[in-house]
């Protein structure tokens, strides 16, 4: 069954442990943790987060790395040694994910337009990272991001065909809208390869709104998602300017959870 959750990134720049605590006190039981600095990958710090999850009977679906902005330079440049270094660095993330019980690692990827990117290199580098993740019990996933190569659905379809089972995707609704892509078309194209979703609403008041504040047919979307990827986590990911306080964020999480469970 689909599972509703909230990203700690919604409360940025509140530090991650306080954001997680706020979500816990608000009744959120499933989260994505956004790591914002290297010190937050230290085993003792991650243990603090893990104890907090255990204390409130919460689960962590996924981890978002703070190094997403340097992925083009580290993972997809022509300087091969950087790739080796970045793969080694990702062991910090994957070890933290084991401590947290998280399975999904979110990758933004390169920023070269899809029309001019070296696709063979891209897919080979992604596969190397995916294989490393698998050795830790982690799924490395490609998120669609408007400013990145992954903005393009045709590129993601090529990635799916090239990588097969190792092609796993995070579908971000607001990023699809910003890219001029139809979220439903992305869902239907990538199908069961979608293992994680960042959800929000959109309409005339913005492209990253709380659910129910825009025109996104999220009930229909959730129904289609459940049919092709029933074990997916659906994570509410909003910007801090998009809601008034934690109570409003928690209420939107409850709305999402109820819709997934068929309640009104």
Kindly give the residue locations of the regions a language model identified.
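Distinct, well-ordered alpha-helical segments
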Residues: 15-20, 46, 50, 116-124, ...
